[in-house]
Amino acid sequence: MPAFSTMARQVIESFAANMGVTARAAADHSYGFEFARSGRLSVVPSEDGDRIIVCLARVPHRADASMQRRLFQLAGLDRASSVLVHAGMAPDGAFVLALNLEEERFDMQSLDQALSTLSELHDSIG
């Protein structure tokens, strides 16, 4: 997996500093942040390096069939933000929502907006 560009790393490091945490890249060049309310935010470079994948994983209070159905219904074009949302479940049962950002347009505002969008979508599950 390719590494982030210098600009993208600077955005992620600034984001982390604003949140009061240190940004440390994993071996696969991804970054992960754990938030008490929002869940686990992961920022991952795409295989082709053209996009940045932003994921938010949250362990649901209940993981029954109706909650899972609501999770998967969120997949597709989000009307509010006009971004394509991906939905899935992690091996630990966490609900995962993700979206792609164009690397060349990646900045603090787009990362903040991605976190807000994903958090609001998670909240809508119930």
Per-segment meaning from a language model:
Residues 41-61:
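A short acidic-to-branched-hydrophobic micro-motif
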Residues 39-42, 104:
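Short, charged/polar, Gly/Pro-enriched secondary-structure boundary elements
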Residues 18, 73-78, 114-125:
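Conserved short hydrophobic interaction patches
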Residues 31, 50-52, 94-95:
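Hydrophobic residues embedded in beta-strands of well-ordered beta-sheets
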Residues 55-94:
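Short, internal acidic amphipathic alpha-helical interface segments
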Residues 84-113, 120-126:
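Well-ordered alpha/beta subsegment
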Residues 35, 56-58, 99-103:
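Short beta-strand-to-loop capping motifs
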Residues 1-40, 80-84, 90:
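Charge-rich, low-complexity N-terminal segments
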